[in-house]
């Protein structure tokens, strides 16, 4: 049996990615978890598998397909989930956290599991509308919306694993895709030169344009991105 509510420690978790999801699974494997759990999720949704974002981008899966813990799961385990609530203040003396939606929750134990932020190359024009990152479902939804526009084109800066997954997904959505990569071969940290060339050819066969040894100078456009200019003037 679960311990009475008044004897449970108040556990507050900031972030609702894969790590806190697995932590809760292990916690609830015990017969007596002993915690009253509250989660603040900056995203307006339940827990999902971020590793499966690429199939969502390509159209092979939907958000519903990659949910790991649905609303019923949180309810079943007595977890309070605040969706779309970004924590903006932690009061360590009062042992409370407060969100941008005005919710304040007390805690006995606090877990901060917000994950990482995507790196945006600090190039001139990086803040133009239409310059996107690839980290969460909102980013994927934005890219899919752009791909639906007539004659949509995409430039992916970076020929690592994530960049190539994004390029492949955008191509499957019907976009004209070009990958710009600084090094001589793709995925040079994981593949040797011969394998990198084989991968490049496989992507070219999918009608994805590849430009290696491409050093980006700036992103051009008035209010919205229009093109990417390389240091050699291309």
Model-derived regions: residue spans:
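FAD-binding core/adjacent interface of flavoenzyme oxidoreductases
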Residues: 1-12, 68-157, 213, 228-234
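Beta1-alpha1 glycine-rich phosphate/pyrophosphate-binding loop at the start
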Residues: 2-80, 167-194
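A general structural signal for well-ordered alpha-helical segments in protein cores
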Residues: 20, 50, 67, 120, ...
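A Rossmann-like FAD-binding core segment of flavoenzymes
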Residues: 36, 75, 81-98, 105, ...
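Active-site/binding-pocket entry motifs
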Residues: 45-46, 117-120, 224
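Rossmann-like NAD(P)H-binding beta-loop-alpha module
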Residues: 142-191, 225
């Amino acid at each position: 049996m679960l311990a009475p509510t008044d004897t449970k420690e108040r556990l507050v978790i900031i972030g609702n990615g894969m790590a806190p999801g697995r932590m809760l699974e292990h916690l609830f494997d015990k017969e007596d978890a002993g915690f009253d759990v509250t989660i603040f999720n900056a995203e307006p949704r339940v827990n999902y598998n971020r590793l499966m974002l690429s199939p969502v981008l390509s159209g092979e899966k939907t958000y519903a397909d990659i949910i790991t813990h649905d609303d019923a799961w949180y309810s079943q385990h007595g977890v309070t989930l605040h969706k779309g609530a970004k924590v903006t203040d932690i009061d360590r003396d009062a042992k409370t956290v407060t969100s941008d939606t005005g919710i304040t929750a007390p805690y006995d134990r606090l877990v901060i599991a917000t994950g990482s932020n995507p790196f945006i190359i600090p190039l001139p024009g990086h803040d133009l509308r239409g310059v996107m990152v690839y980290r969460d479902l909102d980013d994927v939804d934005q890219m899919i919306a752009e791909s639906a526009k007539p004659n949509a084109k995409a430039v992916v800066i970076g020929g690592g694993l994530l960049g190539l997954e994004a390029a492949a997904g955008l191509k499957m959505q019907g976009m004209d895709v070009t990958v710009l990569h600084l090094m001589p071969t793709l995925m040079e940290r994981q593949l040797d030169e011969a394998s990198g060339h084989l991968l490049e050819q496989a992507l070219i066969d999918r009608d994805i344009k590849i430009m290696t040894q491409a050093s980006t100078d700036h992103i051009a456009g008035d209010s919205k991105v229009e093109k990417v200019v390389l240091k050699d003037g291309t």
